[in-house]
């Protein structure tokens, strides 16, 4: 979520949602699109992950910025001057309640800012979506449809919503602990026990979503954030821009082609109706990366990548796989199953012997060196510059960028070849 050209948008389900979040009615005052010049003035802040439900502290937002006078002194830091400019461009109801601190992410029709509640001084993230654009409106509707229903420790929480005729402001929790793999690289130690603890939190969140009839459809490491920098931080699932929400008892089959290539399930590639088992396939890919620092399916050529996924062919060769338990490999195998009906559900995955036994284990082999080396090696091979490749922050390159999102035309061609091969 966050970029109109990066994903195929989901179909809006026809169901009745339970609104648990405060909604502020549209502002009736005079409107002017003062935001249209905003992008060019805040150009030094990098984009925020694949979507913007939560913000990592890694975006380096500026510290609490005091109010600036109308005339900026020549020595005023550029970042502070920019903050002063875009702070005034938010709806007055938002700025009356929240102090805008820094821009921490942006997409083609959305911006995310770090804010502080004026009364409590509690930090939050506000996502502003331009709903005057069709893509922004559809993504906003999809995300709100989910976030207004969910209350779970491992899912990003929506606090309140402000609406105008052309924009929606979503106030959310602010995740400051960083991305999953950044934490692994920085930690210095990572065992199968650590992996199962991460997966337990993610699986519990996914189990909750599936019980509500919600399918995420874009689970990947960059959408899994640590809530705070502490060692006891929980993992939260973010980015529900492609999620599908069906009321209980409704038709559970989905047809929209969407997702990120390396994590997309085979049944989506061949454009068959699918269920929430696509989330479990993605979790299998995540588990594989979590234990090795490498991808089970990877190729710069999309067609070859999709063929690998359709065959379900991957291997456990290279480090650190010889040191990984057979139970862990069995866990992955039961998720990376081409037949969606044979895949484990979230509840079954939580009850898998590996998750149950390793989570209670007191000592396991440290896999950190191999995992971090593999993550950084892959990052280096995909970075545009040597400098970024050598940086620890370059581990963010393990994510799939906009140019590697699923394209409908490619899947139509792939599906045609699939039908010719297997049906004719």
Curated annotation (Swiss-Prot):
Subunit structure: Homodimer.
Biased composition (Polar residues): 57-72
Residue intervals of the Protein kinase domain: 98-355
Molecular function GO terms recorded: ATP binding; protein serine kinase activity; protein serine/threonine kinase activity
One cellular component term from this protein's GO annotations in UniProt: nuclear speck
Enzyme class name: transferase
Compartment list: Golgi apparatus; Cytoplasm, Cytoskeleton, Microtubule organizing center, Centrosome; Nucleus speckle; Endoplasmic reticulum membrane
UniProt-listed SMART domains: S_TKc
Gene3D superfamilies noted in UniProt: Transferase(Phosphotransferase) domain 1 (1.10.510.10)
Post-translational modification, as annotated: Autophosphorylated on serine residues. Myristoylated. Required for membrane association. Prerequisite for palmitoylation to occur.
Membrane topology category: Lipid-anchor
Record-linked Pfam families: Pkinase (PF00069)
Family the UniProt entry places it in: Belongs to the protein kinase superfamily. CAMK Ser/Thr protein kinase family.
GO terms for biological process, alphabetical: determination of left/right symmetry; heart development
Keywords: ATP-binding, Cell membrane, Cytoplasm, Cytoskeleton, Endoplasmic reticulum, Golgi apparatus, Kinase, Lipoprotein, Membrane, Myristate, Nucleotide-binding, Nucleus, Palmitate, Phosphoprotein, Serine/threonine-protein kinase, Transferase
Name assigned to this protein: Serine/threonine-protein kinase H1
Alphabetized CDD domains for the sequence: STKc_PSKH1
Positions with a binding annotation for ATP: 104-112, 127
């Amino acid at each position: 979520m966050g970029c109109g050209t990066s994903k195929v948008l989901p179909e809006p389900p026809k169901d009745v949602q339970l609104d648990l979040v405060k909604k502020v009615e549209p502002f009736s005052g005079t409107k002017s699109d003062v935001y249209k010049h905003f992008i060019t003035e805040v150009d030094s802040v990098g984009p925020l992950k694949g979507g913007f439900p939560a913000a990592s502290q890694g975006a380096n937002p500026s510290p609490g910025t005091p109010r600036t006078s109308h005339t900026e002194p020549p020595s005023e830091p550029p970042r502070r001057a920019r903050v002063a400019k875009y702070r005034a461009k938010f709806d007055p109801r938002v700025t009356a309640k929240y102090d805008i601190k820094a821009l921490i992410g942006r997409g083609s029709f959305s911006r995310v800012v770090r804010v502080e509640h004026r009364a409590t001084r509690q930090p939050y993230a506000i996502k502003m979506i331009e709903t005057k654009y069709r893509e922004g409106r559809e993504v906003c509707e999809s995300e709100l449809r989910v976030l207004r229903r969910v209350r779970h420790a491992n899912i990003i929480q929506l606090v309140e919503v402000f609406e105008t005729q052309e924009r929606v402001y979503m106030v959310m929790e602010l995740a400051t602990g960083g991305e999953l793999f950044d934490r692994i690289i920085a930690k210095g130690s990572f065992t199968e026990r650590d992996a199962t603890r991460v997966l337990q939190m993610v699986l519990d969140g996914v189990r909750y979503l599936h019980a509500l009839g919600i399918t995420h459809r874009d689970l990947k490491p960059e959408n899994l954030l640590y809530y705070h920098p502490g060692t006891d931080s929980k993992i939260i699932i973010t980015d529900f821009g492609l999620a599908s929400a069906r009321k209980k008892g409704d038709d559970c089959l989905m047809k929209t082609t969407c997702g990120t290539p390396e994590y997309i399930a085979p049944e989506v590639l061949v454009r068959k109706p699918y269920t929430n088992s696509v989330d479990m396939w993605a979790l299998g890919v995540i588990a594989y990366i979590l234990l090795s620092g490498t991808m089970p399916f990877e190729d710069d050529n999309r067609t070859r990548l999709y063929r690998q996924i359709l065959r379900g062919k991957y291997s456990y060769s290279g480090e650190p796989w010889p040191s990984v338990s057979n139970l862990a490999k069995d866990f992955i195998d039961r998720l990376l199953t081409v037949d969606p009906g044979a895949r484990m559900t979230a509840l079954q995955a939580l009850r898998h012997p590996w998750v149950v036994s390793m989570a209670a284990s007191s000592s396991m082999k440290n896999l950190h060196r191999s995992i971090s080396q593999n993550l950084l090696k892959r990052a280096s091979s995909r970075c545009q510059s040597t400098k970024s490749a050598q940086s620890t922050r370059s581990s963010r390159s393990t994510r799939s960028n906009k140019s590697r999102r699923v394209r409908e035309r490619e899947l139509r061609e792939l599906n045609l070849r699939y039908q010719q091969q297997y049906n004719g």
